[in-house]
Amino acid sequence: MTDRIELTTANEFIARHIGPRAADELAMLQTLGFDSIEALSESVIPESIKGTSVLNLPAGQSEADALASIKAIASKNQLFKTYIGQGYYNTHTPAPILRNLLENPAWYTAYTPYQPEISQGRLESLLNFQTLISDLTGLPIANASLLDEATAAAEAMTFCKRLSKNKASQQFFASSHCHPQTLDVLRTRAEPLGITVVVADEHELGDVSDYFGALLQYPASNGDVFDYRELVERFHAANALVAVAADLLALTLLTPPGEFGADVAIGSAQRFGVPLGFGGPHAAYFSTRDAFKRDMPGRLVGVSVDRHGKQALRLAMQTREQHIRREKATSNICTAQVLLANIASMYAVYHGPRGLTQIANRVHQLTAILAEGLSTLGLNAEQAFFFDSLTLHTGDRTAALHAAARARHINLREIDDQRLGLSLDETTSQSAVETLWAIFANDGQSLPDFAALADSVQSRLPAGLLRQSAILSHPVFNRYHSETELMRYLRKLADKDLALDRTMIPLGSCTMKLNAASEMIPVTWAEFGNLHPFAPAEQSAGYQQLTDELEAMLCAATGYDAISLQPNAGSQGEYAGLLAIRAYHQSRGDEHRDICLIPSSAHGTNPATANMAGMRVVVTACDARGNVDIEDLRAKAVQHRDQLAAIMITYPSTHGVFEEGIREICGIVHDNGGQVYIDGANMNAMVGLCAPGKFGGDVSHLNLHKTFCIPHGGGGPGVGPIGVKSHLAPFMPGHARMERKEGAVCAAPFGSASILPITWMYIRMMGGEGLKRASQLAILNANYISRRLEEHYPVLYTGSNGLVAHECILDLRPIKDSSGISVDDVAKRLIDFGFHAPTMSFPVAGTLMIEPTESESREELDRFCDAMIKIREEIRAVENGTLDKDDNPLKNAPHTAAEIVGQWSHPYSREQAVYPVDSLIENKYWPPVGRVDNVFGDRNLVCACPSIENYQEA
């Protein structure tokens, strides 16, 4: 009798996503002393939380079926021609950037470039981005992206507060000409900090002595181009700082903010090649004066040298960041928008200064022609000067004009019942302008002559604000203008880096799992990419279905009652979660509850976020096994019971174990009046096995760019939705375009909406069974590595059963004491083996935290373990004197090709340096630089493209 042939394709994707094959899985289980994956799960998960997860999800669809399903959803979105503007514009993504960057796993699967030696490609692209921003804004220091324009404005507000000499002031001025969504996010950020945001027309502003800072929009949201020079001087005279939200494309033609006195410039790089995406993700920017660089939020790429004196790039001044300064950090932002910043960077590289200026001139000329034509039809723009946006007083015709436009599949900006607006962009054509005239013309009116107006129309930019300074003079912006050259430049940069397309990235607490191609495909569909976030609701039915279904999926995975998809990073999810707790306490008259308990092992974002949410941090101790010290927690909860707002706790713990006492911890906090925030960074060990919403959590954020397969993008984008129990649901983030209007934490109602299809696809293809399998295999893979390496490196923390969760921590401190070899030396030596290092010195200094994820095969796990064992042998050779304690393969790692072919004076061989295992002979990654000098980089800070002489030397 023949075997039964399987006729269904359900669940077939599971085996594509999960790395170990059946025979390997069984062998790995046997190594651990188990005969089934269920037995391992039963042993790892604490008894008190077993059975809390009931994944009520259908079976997984095949890749083809899931793509067909999401295509049907996408087709429900209506793609109108949009002239809404308001910070979001249609753009052309150049095809070579789409194909060679956005759709290239060498770019989108990379991690944040904390290991500079294996990140030189994307660091160079980010340095180009910083140079682009610095040039266009006229300010010397720019960061490597923020989350969106509105959150960048909020960062600018707190930046001004820190630096203003008007220390007594708690008032921040925001122009009423700023984008409305920016003002909403400012209000959200200001309230917990005791800051009052005063929104008014700057032209009616009297005394400014009560303000510590100001935000101005340039050009204004309604289209006006104002001269702010005198106003900036007034604010400076009052010891206030001035931030300007500026349109990058307009800055190719207009005087940059830095030249009229602005202290900070912020904005969005979206219109540099990044689709609308229903609101995101898009890269924001932040630039400032050199004197303020150490107070900047976000990551900063700087120029340094490697140990051979060769120019090398790195992340600079990391002591500002939350993973080091914790509650004293300049910001809680961790993941930003690197992938989108790189798209904008390459858009500028491809077009160059001339191309960008041509685009800007064309957009402005078309807007001027449109305005002149409307004037002949009896409609005059309210603005005397403008770049690309107009406001029209249309009176009683307003509603009818919107209806007429929509009948032609066109969206105009809704301002009020008497006025409307429109913004042009690089996709606007002559025929589009003529269609707009036809909409506004009364019956019987002749349409203007486009050609005649094109010959006669004058610029509507103010003569006194025309840009005089040059832009983008560096060679990188003047060389790669043919597709061939750009394609090769992108390939050259990608080849410098290590991403998931080449190797496992075993970073603890980062969950660098497979980003399957089928999950990525919908991201570039026009139905998801070309929808404006403020389009009429009936045009986004597909997105509404997608978000409704995804929220239900995530509720099923977490045990929570409601989900908000708005937070566009894990840091924003943390923030939204604590704001929900704060608002809940306030609604009950408990405004005095402001103490947040945080274990000493917590990630630095936790205390930084608590500080932003207006809470006071009280640190609780951990015991010798890395668990929360429950008695210390109990004592502090009782001590602060009248002020206790919340606890922030990561589960499984930051130490990589399932703490037995998690239910007791939650109970202690609840008994003393607090709420439980369970950080979802480690959710990849729990889906299908236990649910935080069912064992005591009141709110959690999830990292969709970890557990749910959105790629890290080299440092973003991320999505950090929150799940809440029903009593917190009324306090989730709101938005002007949602039922709840208050509490927006980012500019768009659904945050980074255009990458949500990735998570929808992952869950739909895995189904409930597959999601549980993913968690189980993540735990198996981590325990397999732990078991293989424990005789070579002590595993610092395990559960009571001797097992870890989905990651393990290797203690290298004894090695440092016995040999002088540091955790940094081991991390750099792994590069010679072709591996990205695990997480270094977090959560414990002198350790490596390893998280392999479920996507890695046994072969890859063994390759990594073999590398670590070989490195231990080299360390042993240092310990016994066989290798010199200072001149050895670890201290000199990583080794470059240039070093190998040059003069060789080391006491170990070239072969040992670069081919420590035979498998590298067939497949070798060559780092482009040697070990980077961090101290040199911070002491000699350069954060823009170096001069042509340095460029040639490099």
From Swiss-Prot:
Keyword annotations for this protein, in alphabetical order, are: Oxidoreductase, Pyridoxal phosphate
The modified positions for N6-(pyridoxal phosphate)lysine read: K706
The catalytic activity, as recorded, is: N(6)-[(R)-lipoyl]-L-lysyl-[glycine-cleavage complex H protein] + glycine + H(+) = N(6)-[(R)-S(8)-aminomethyldihydrolipoyl]-L-lysyl-[glycine-cleavage complex H protein] + CO2
Family according to the record: Belongs to the GcvP family.
Residues spanning the signal sequence? none
Subunit organization: The glycine cleavage system is composed of four proteins: P, T, L and H.
One Pfam entry for this protein is: GDC-P
Coiled-coil residue windows: none
| Cofactor needs | pyridoxal 5'-phosphate
Q: What SUPFAM superfamilies does UniProt report for this protein, alphabetically?
A: PLP-dependent transferases (SSF53383)
Q: What class of enzyme is it?
A: oxidoreductase
Q: Please name the InterPro entries in this protein's record.
A: GcvP, GDC-P_C, GDC-P_N, GDC_P, PyrdxlP-dep_Trfase, PyrdxlP-dep_Trfase_major, PyrdxlP-dep_Trfase_small
Which lineage is the organism of this entry classified under, starting from the top rank? Bacteria, Pseudomonadati, Pseudomonadota, Gammaproteobacteria, Pseudomonadales
**Statement: the UniProt record of this protein carries the keyword Oxidoreductase:** yes
One Gene Ontology cellular component annotation? glycine cleavage complex
One GO biological process term: glycine decarboxylation via glycine cleavage system
Q: What is this protein called?
A: Glycine dehydrogenase (decarboxylating)
